[in-house]
Amino acid sequence: MSEAPQHIPVLVNECLSLFADRNPKFFCDVTLGAGGHAEAFLSAYPSIVSYDGSDRDTMALSLAKERLEKFGNRVHLHHASFEDLAQNPRENVYDGILADLGVSSMQLDTLSRGFSFQGDDHDLDMRMDTSKGTTASEVLNTLREEDLGRIFREYGEEPQWKNAAKAIVQFRRHKKIITVRDLKEATTRVFPSYRLRKKIHPLTLIFQALRVYVNQEDVQLKVFLESAMRWLAPEGRLIIISFCSSEDRPVKWFFREAEAMGVGKILTKKVVMPTYEETRKNPRCRSAKLRCFEKKSS
């Protein structure tokens, strides 16, 4: 596969339609990526005078800067995690906030980042922000079997979590797990034969779990959800796109709790998913789920 980064924003039309009845002025995109959603919003809504875009990934920010340059001073870019953004003292500001969770096609296709199980000879890094933090390789070589099992179970919901953790610990006794190939070799006998025959790679859930743990995505998401409600202007709308149940579940329950407490209302009573046409063009979006919450008027 090519190392050339690609970026295919998902559920773009569905995101845009959630603001069809209004003219947003201030927008916040906390997972800017290469700027696909940002470009769509800025083009569709000339009313947006300030689009704050942030990301932990400096490579993504560089691409977004180039892509969004045509919008001039309407765009403001920031290198920041959700926890960094939580320090933002702003309240009741944004008409719209967008979070597109998980890993992007661009990150998957840049095999040197270690997010994809297709890059056999590349190191298992998996950090969104490569300037700091622990790599997936370091996690695999240092954590106890019990802790690895918990990660695979909680963050990947991997049925073979116990066997996978055991196999990894046994393998690293004679060889460190550095590359994608090493992890494949370590887990070669973990998965039942029917998993090996499926289109979805058997290591998908293990990779997901490692990525979530390495980037503390569960902690980051909790911090973001609490901050977003503070940032939203009255009648402001929060859109969250998730790609797995460990991301979608906390969003769903947070929205339900916020609605029950009178903070606002859930606009997507049924989760919004990609159309057949979109999944045909971009198979990676097949598991995407969109939820939207509107803050009360006052």
From Swiss-Prot:
Database matches in InterPro entries: RsmH (IPR002903), SAM-dep_MeTrfase_MraW_recog (IPR023397), SAM-dependent_MTases_sf (IPR029063)
Major location (coarse): cytoplasm
Entry's localization field: Cytoplasm
EC number: 2.1.1.199
GO biological process: rRNA base methylation
Keywords tagged on the record: Cytoplasm, Methyltransferase, rRNA processing, S-adenosyl-L-methionine, Transferase
Catalytic activity: cytidine(1402) in 16S rRNA + S-adenosyl-L-methionine = N(4)-methylcytidine(1402) in 16S rRNA + S-adenosyl-L-homocysteine + H(+)
Keyword S-adenosyl-L-methionine: yes
Superkingdom of origin: Bacteria
GO cellular component, one term: cytoplasm
Membrane-traversing stretches: none
GO MF: rRNA (cytosine-N4-)-methyltransferase activity
Positions that bind S-adenosyl-L-methionine: G35, G36, H37, D55, F82, D100, Q107
One Pfam family linked to the record: Methyltransf_5
Its job: Specifically methylates the N4 position of cytidine in position 1402 (C1402) of 16S rRNA.
Protein family per UniProt: Belongs to the methyltransferase superfamily. RsmH family.
PANTHER family xrefs: 12S RRNA N4-METHYLCYTIDINE METHYLTRANSFERASE (PTHR11265:SF0), S-ADENOSYL-METHYLTRANSFERASE MRAW (PTHR11265)
Name of the featured protein: Ribosomal RNA small subunit methyltransferase H
Gene: rsmH
